[in-house]
């Protein structure tokens, strides 16, 4: 909600490119109900967000446990630091493909779906490197070599800046968890992006 003391603009954050709803201050007495969402108590939306957050947490837990088993030294502090960073990156990618940040729904899923399980690790290393590079900083032949990878946008903010995180090898089970359970079967756009 934005106000210039004459008009209120109500922007729907679920549709950031949509036109705002406009409410005149002079009409507030008769149109106040249009601002009811500001004082919603115990709404279905909040309950739904909590339910989605719990489901997302369970999925991340399953993914975390499956990844942890693949590390050579699963108790080492460096391993746990890498695993945490990897999980955040994967959740971001899952969110970004569902929320349209990558430009096309299922883009992350489609990038990995035809990669054999043994090649997922390398594909993620390459993807994370590309996500951290502005288009003008990327290999000028990337689009020729790998158009699917070149199509990913630059993600600012440093989430993908550290290339030294350890990514373990993937198994068929782990690939299935990531692509089927986490990507195909769950809509990450329903979670709050503030977790990033």
Question: Where do the model's predicted regions map?
Answer:
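Preference for the N-terminal adenyl/adenosyl cofactor-binding alpha/beta module
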Residues: 3, 32-196
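Glycine-rich phosphate-binding loops of NTPases
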Residues: 16-42
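Nucleic-acid nuclease catalytic cores
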Residues: 1-18, 87
């Amino acid at each position: 909600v934005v106000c210039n003391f004459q008009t209120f603009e109500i922007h729907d954050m679920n549709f950031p490119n949509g036109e705002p709803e406009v409410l005149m201050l002079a009409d507030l007495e008769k149109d106040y109900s249009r601002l009811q969402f500001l004082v919603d108590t115990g709404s279905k939306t909040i309950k739904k967000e909590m339910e989605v957050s719990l489901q997302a947490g369970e999925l991340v837990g399953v993914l975390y446990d499956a990844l942890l088993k693949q590390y050579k030294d699963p108790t080492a502090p460096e391993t746990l630091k890498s695993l945490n960073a990897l999980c955040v990156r994967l959740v971001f990618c899952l969110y970004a493909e569902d929320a349209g940040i990558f430009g096309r729904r299922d883009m992350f899923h489609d990038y990995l779906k035809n990669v054999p399980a043994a090649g997922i690790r390398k594909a993620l290393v390459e993807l994370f490197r590309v996500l951290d590079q502005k288009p003008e900083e990327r290999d000028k032949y990337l689009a020729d070599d790998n158009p699917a990878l070149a199509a990913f946008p630059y993600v600012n903010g440093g989430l993908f800046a550290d290339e030294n995180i350890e990514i373990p090898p993937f198994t068929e089970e782990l690939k299935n968890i990531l692509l089927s359970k986490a990507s195909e079967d769950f809509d990450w756009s329903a979670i709050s992006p503030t977790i990033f």
